[in-house]
Amino acid sequence: MKRLWDISPPVSAASPVFPGDTPYQQHWKWSLTPDCPVNVSEIRLSPHIGAHADAPLHYSNGAPAIGAVPLEPFLGPCRVIHALDCGPLILPEHLRHAADGLPPRVLVRTAEHAALDWWTDDFSAYAPHTIEWLAERGVVLIGLDTPSIDPASSKTLDSHHVILRRDMRVLENLLLDDVAEGDYELIALPLALAQADASPVRAILRELG
């Protein structure tokens, strides 16, 4: 059997969210008792918690919701590239060492350890021209191990708007701590949420061959 890597962080009340966004909340609607045959919970959360896929609707009014986005970009050959300690922005120079023959999907690991249970504004994001550089090489999906492809302080979301213009897809908040550089098969399908601006994904990598 081919090896799998689970690159989705656990989702719980401790999961970090952007300040002001909705944290994970869960309570039990029904509990298993002699009079009730099941446990059923109610969950409230931001669709941007944990590993998730942004929809174009997230950064453009009237653009498609995540349930209307084609699934093909979220499934297929992928390359993981390490850009550890790249600083605030991922630049082409951080990726060139692994850029020969890029597959259509690129995930970048920027940190030794992902922030699983604390929020920090000090995370790495994509420089907009890096996304252009990847798009010119046939990349249709990018991802990373931080909360956003734009800096936390950005009010213009320049990298998101490159994604929009290039009709690319994005995965954020991935857990790449234990993944070596190299090529894999990515499987990270969003839910068919008809009106949502994003969706949680259970992102995994599978060895090729």
Curated annotation (Swiss-Prot):
Which parts of the sequence bind substrate?
Answer: F18
Pathway assignment: Amino-acid degradation; L-tryptophan degradation via kynurenine pathway; L-kynurenine from L-tryptophan: step 2/2
**Which domain of life does the protein's organism represent?**
Bacteria
Q: Name one GO molecular function term.
A: zinc ion binding
Q: Which cofactor does it need?
A: Zn(2+)
Where, by residue number, does Zn(2+) 2 bind? D54, H160, E172
Subunit composition? Homodimer.
Spell out the family assignment given in the record's similarity comment: Belongs to the Cyclase 1 superfamily. KynB family.
Q: What is this protein called?
A: Kynurenine formamidase
The scientific name of the source species is Bordetella petrii (strain ATCC BAA-461 / DSM 12804 / CCUG 43448)
Tell me the organism's taxonomic lineage: Bacteria, Pseudomonadati, Pseudomonadota, Betaproteobacteria, Burkholderiales
